């Protein structure tokens, strides 16, 4: 609990009452009513301009913040406690902040810091110059077609996802007889590129006739390709759910309107016509360049032979699921990206969920987003009901043995809709999520299942089997133009005119 000698480290704190069960402290509504009654006209105007209920509550709670200053007057050593509703968990917390005087750096330390910054800047500029030089020289040397196809990603370690299905289809249609297929991958956008790939990537980008990407890929937006080159985006997610790219302009983390990000794509392949305007907006490209052939990695979902095979494999790998009702809990992460990604597991009453599993002969598989840093800790007494499959195989394989999906804002709902089985949406922070991230269509009328905003409501839906499953088939028909397992085939034929 110590943090550099301070009893309470800076963070947000819940108040929890421990008895036979844990109860999280709640905010008394009377406090809010009293705070609102004390506002003057100017404050009421500011209050009314706020767009979310939590934002309005936090505006009122801010007046109850307590500030403690060293010696009672210090401007530099300050300890602040602010009550608020935390947006990422939708719970009442106390936000603790400590402000300390900045240590003055000596001349030597200041000079060393300046030199380090200049060195880092020079290194970046030299690497950028070398990258563009290799690319431009290679591009000039390959004015004519080079008969080369490149698969590249800055967030994928190998040929998987949509890439794998497109690659296999290229081989099936014998495109590899006419083209040399190359790959350059990096597991994570923050990882350093292999030394050899620092030269291979700009060389192959300048040479390749067809370049496949499946996510944000910063380096390809810094160069100008030949008019004859095709830059093909096979986006890793199915459908248009949460806003991305230029759809987020003006929001936190969104690009400026004059950004070059994504605009390089000459083709983007999507699942249905309904996705076209959303992806065109997100990537800043023309609608005619967005083609609804279907998403390659969904082909396997329509393969009956594979379904039989993978069900047996999954039961062998996870014997706990044999003869059980399988519930997959697969939410998206909270936080502002890879560095701060987490999931608030305290929003799950594991004891109550275990009792449900015992009563209904069920097991829960937890599949957390790859970004989530805090690991799920399953207690010994709950291991007969719960299992963490976050590190297990492709999530699509798990869908084949899943009887019920519990999610929130994950695009996994598109793939699971193929199975025409029930879903529950545990969206405890919906209002704030809409404000910060937003969706292409109204969430409440869009998702194919029951929406619950508390764990009590989630358990009620499970107990009564209130899933609103009638929403699934219309959702599937709207977002999957093709339901035949031939999306990869259509994509390759469209691109190579075969």
Regions found by a protein language model. Name each.
Residues 8, 18, 25-30, 37, ...:
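N-terminal pre-catalytic "stem/leader" segment of glycosyltransferase-like enzymes
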Residues 135, 306, 362, 455-498:
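C-terminal amphipathic helix plus adjacent low-complexity
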Residues 158-169, 290, 296-378, 452:
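Conserved catalytic-core segment of nucleotide-activated headgroup transferases in glycan assembly
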Residues 164-167, 188-257:
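Extended catalytic core of nucleotide-activated donor transferases of GT-like folds
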Residues 379-382, 411-479:
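Catalytic binding pocket for nucleotide-activated donors in carbohydrate/polymer assembly enzymes
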């Amino acid at each position: 609990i110590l943090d550099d000698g301070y009893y309470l480290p800076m963070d947000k704190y819940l108040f929890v009452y421990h008895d036979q069960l844990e109860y999280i402290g709640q905010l008394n509504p009377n406090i809010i009513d009293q705070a609102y009654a004390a506002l003057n006209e100017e404050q009421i105007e500011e209050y009314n301009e706020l767009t979310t209920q939590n934002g309005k509550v936090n505006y009122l709670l801010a007046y109850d913040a307590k500030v403690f200053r060293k010696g009672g007057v210090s401007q530099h050593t300050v300890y602040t406690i602010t009550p608020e509703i935390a947006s990422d968990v939708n719970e009442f917390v106390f936000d603790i902040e400590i402000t300390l005087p900045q240590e003055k750096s000596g001349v030597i330390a200041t000079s060393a810091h300046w030199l380090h910054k200049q060195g880092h800047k020079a290194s970046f500029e030299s690497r950028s110059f070398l990258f563009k030089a290799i690319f431009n020289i290679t591009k000039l040397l390959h004015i004519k077609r080079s008969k080369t196809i490149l698969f590249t990603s800055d967030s994928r370690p190998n040929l998987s996802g949509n890439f794998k299905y497109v690659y296999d289809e290229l081989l099936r249609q014998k495109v590899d007889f006419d083209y040399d297929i190359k790959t350059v991958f990096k597991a994570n956008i923050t990882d350093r590129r292999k030394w050899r790939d620092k030269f291979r990537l700009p060389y192959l980008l300048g040479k390749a006739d067809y370049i496949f990407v499946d996510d944000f890929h910063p380096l390809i937006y810094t160069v100008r390709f030949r008019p004859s080159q095709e830059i093909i985006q096979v986006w890793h997610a199915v459908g248009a759910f949460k806003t991305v790219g230029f759809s987020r302009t003006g929001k936190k983390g969104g690009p400026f309107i004059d950004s070059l990000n994504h605009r390089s794509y000459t083709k983007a392949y999507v699942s249905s016509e309904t996705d076209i305007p959303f992806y065109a907006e997100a990537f800043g490209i023309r609608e005619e360049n967005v083609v609804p052939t279907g998403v390659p990695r969904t082909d396997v979902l329509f393969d009956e032979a594979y379904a039989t095979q993978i069900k047996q494999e999954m039961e062998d790998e996870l014997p706990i699921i044999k003869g059980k009702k399988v519930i997959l809990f697969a939410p998206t992460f909270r936080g502002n990206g890879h560095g701060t990604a987490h999931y608030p597991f305290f929003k799950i009453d594991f004891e109550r969920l275990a009792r449900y599993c015992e009563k209904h002969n069920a097991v829960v598989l937890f599949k957390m987003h790859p970004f989530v840093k805090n690991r799920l800790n399953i207690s010994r007494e709950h291991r007969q009901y719960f299992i963490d499959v976050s590190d297990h195989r492709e999530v699509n394989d798990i869908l084949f043995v899943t009887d019920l999906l519990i999610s929130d804002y994950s695009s996994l709902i598109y793939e699971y809709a193929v199975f025409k089985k029930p879903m529950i949406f545990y969206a405890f922070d919906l209002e704030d999520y809409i404000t910060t991230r937003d969706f292409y269509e109204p969430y409440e009328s869009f998702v194919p299942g029951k929406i619950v905003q508390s764990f009590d409501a989630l358990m009620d839906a499970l107990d009564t089997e209130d899933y609103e499953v009638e929403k699934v088939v219309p959702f599937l028909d709207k977002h999957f133009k093709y339901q035949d397992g031939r999306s990869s085939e259509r994509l390759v034929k469209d691109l190579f005119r075969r």
